[in-house]
Amino acid sequence: MSHVKHSGRRRGFTLIEALVVVAILSTLLALVVPSAVEWIRVQRVKASADELVTDLQFARSEATRRNLEVAVTFRTVAAQTCYTIHTRNAFGSCKCELGNGNACSFGIADNRFELKTVSLPTSNAVSLTSSLSSSIYSPASAFVVGMNALQVAIDGGDDRKLRVQTNATGRPSICAPTGSTIKGYTTCP
């Protein structure tokens, strides 16, 4: 019979050591998770503002490129806030709540008016509130028709707020309203 000789040193972790590691990791997670959730919420607001600025610039350029008036129409319905970029038409305003590809169909098989529709479901915890129901860009100058400045409040709950605004020429920019906790933007006038 052979005997295996054990050295005096054991390998592995004891139950106490494993519990200490679990306790330390739990404490670290409790500190990190709330800040990670907050970071995600702030990123949603920033991404919504950035996308809206890009879409307003797109609407301006499409008005010039197509030599047609291009509108950005905002709507709020129970389950979402949304907007549609579309060419002006004789059928009326587009309804972004009908979804991408259907917002400007007006019962016509050829949906040639809709350029883009963006929806923000309320479950996303970000909402848009526009000072105008529509902002229309002129093909001749890419300025806003009527020189009406647009302000869109982007609200992510609590103090996570940004504002996208256009000047009289239609150029969009992002600012942080007073009291916003989102850093890196100028304060809105």
Regions found by a protein language model. Name each.
Residues 2-9, 27-53, 57, 61, ...:
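N-terminal helix-rich module
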